[in-house]
Curated annotation (Swiss-Prot):
Homodimer. InterPro entries: PyrdxlP-dep_Trfase, PyrdxlP-dep_Trfase_major, PyrdxlP-dep_Trfase_small, Ser_HO-MeTrfase, Ser_HO-MeTrfase-like, Ser_HO-MeTrfase_PLP_BS, SHMT-like_dom. This is Serine hydroxymethyltransferase. GO terms for molecular function: glycine hydroxymethyltransferase activity; pyridoxal phosphate binding. GO terms for cellular component: cytoplasm. It comes from the Archaea. The gene is glyA. Keywords: Amino-acid biosynthesis, Cytoplasm, One-carbon metabolism, Pyridoxal phosphate, Transferase. The modification N6-(pyridoxal phosphate)lysine is found at K228.
């Protein structure tokens, strides 16, 4: 063709604009996102993305998988090492798919599961509106302690003993404080129930020793995604120290929920696991320090920050109640207009019907921490947010400040210093910026 189609030009331009905007010009505070290192991105862009490898390493249904087998095995070994586990499966293509495989193994349709209450942050996949519901498993919420913003342990123990569920689920997506795994696991096991922990949001904190390891506190199996506080490619993972239950889940991931498992994730996951092996503790420690400093700064700037009486947060997340400022939908849009990216979120006291315009804003500091920001930068961000939401300044004027602010934080930290050109063979595919 002598002319490039206009649609092709459009696709390239949209990609370029996305990379420029989200990678270099915004303060990204989405709690479920992160950024890979250039090293991980380099191995992510590979021939693996075009290939299939159904089954397990060295037991495939396709030929041509010898390098897939090696890199997948290495990635699982590294993930087990940093998680202090015996068994890992990386074939789930998301945390929700990992949950689906685990739930399918542990209960049949019509049987009961107890989940952490929605007010305490249960993910939609734990509920009747998500994966549990799709599998026909009856979900019952554990009692909620509003003062502690967590599961009510005493009432939960009684419920476990009374209902005798097939399994209980802890972990969540609005997740400021650890759920009581150690306190509830013995009572679950006493009635024959398994304990599932969804670590999607806090997996990087677990591997960085800034959060409790649920498998060391009584959880039987742990699911996760690989792209939140663990800054790898989007994907899922399953971990356990119990061979019998793990084997059943692994045999369910394929062929029940995954055929090909997006092989280009594997080398990038391995690279990220190595980064977290060597730099993860410093990274996780800084995340939690930043979250605490951010919460305190936001409160000082006049925001209503959830959980003040509990120290605001122990995770990467900070949560605002913005009802007095117009509600979550309005404030999230104002922040976006100023290049501060957040998400509106239901708060513990919101009814489910408020999902389109909830009371809250959920924030996460993990990506900005990866770009080298520390406590002082958190205080600067809090001031910018005040200008938009409380002072009522023009978001376009604040946006100029945000873009200028980000110019000093474009390099990914907590990674290896590597000359990528040595490994590219002239075929590296850089980001279009």
């Amino acid at each position: 063709m002598s002319q490039i189609p206009k649609e092709l030009e459009k696709v390239i331009e949209l990609t370029r604009e996305q990379n420029r905007w989200r990678r270099t010009e915004v303060i990204n505070l989405i709690a479920s996102e992160n950024v890979m290192s250039p090293l991980a991105e380099t191995v992510y862009m590979s021939d693996f993305m075009s290939r299939y490898a159904e089954g397990k390493p060295y037991k495939r249904y396709y030929q041509g998988t010898k390098y897939v087998d090696e890199v997948e095995t290495l990635a699982m070994q590294l993930m087990n090492e940093i998680t202090n586990t015996k068994f890992c499966d990386l074939r789930a293509t998301s945390g929700t798919i990992a949950n689906a495989a685990v739930f399918r193994v542990l209960a049949n349709p019509g049987e009961k599961a107890l989940i952490a209450p929605v007010q305490a942050g249960a993910h939609v996949s734990h509920t009747k509106f998500g994966t549990l519901g799709a599998l026909g498993i009856e979900h019952i919420e554990l009692p909620y302690d509003a003062d502690k913003m967590n599961v009510d342990v005493d009432k939960a123990i009684k419920m476990i003993e009374q209902i005798k569920p097939k399994f209980i689920v802890m972990g969540g997506s609005l997740y400021l404080f650890p759920h009581p795994v150690k306190e509830l696991a013995p009572h679950a096991h006493a009635v024959g129930a398994k304990v599932v922990y969804d670590a999607a949001h806090v997996y990087g904190l677990i591997t960085g020793k800034a959060w409790h390891n649920p498998l060391e506190e009584g959880a039987d199996i742990m699911t996760s995604s690989t792209h939140k506080t663990f800054p790898g490619p989007q994907g899922g993972a399953v971990f356990s120290n119990e061979e019998e239950i793990f084997k059943k889940v692994a045999d369910t991931i394929f062929p029940w929920f995954v055929s090909n498992h997006h092989l280009h994730r594997l080398p990038a996951t391995a690279v990220t696991a190595l980064e977290m092996k060597y730099f993860g503790e410093d990274y996780a420690k800084q995340i939690t320090k930043n979250a605490k400093a951010f919460a305190e700064a936001l409160a000082a700037e006049g925001f209503k920050v959830i959980g003040e009486h509990l120290g605001y947060t122990q995770s990467h997340q900070v949560v605002l109640d913005v009802r007095n400022l117009g509600g979550g939908a309005k404030i999230a849009k104002l922040f976006e207009d100023a290049n501060i990216i957040t998400n509106k979120n239901l708060l513990p006291y919101d009814p489910p019907s408020a999902v389109k315009d909830p009371s809250g804003i959920r924030l996460g500091v993990q990506e900005m921490t990866r770009f080298g920001m520390k406590e002082e930068e958190m205080r600067e961000i809090a001031k910018l947010m005040r200008e938009v939401a409380i002072d009522g300044k023009d978001p376009n004027e604040v946006k100029k400040k945000v873009i200028e602010f980000r110019k000093n934080y474009l390099e990914v930290k907590y990674t290896f210093s590597v000359d990528l050109s040595k490994y590219s063979n002239g075929k590296m595919l850089p980001l279009l910026i």
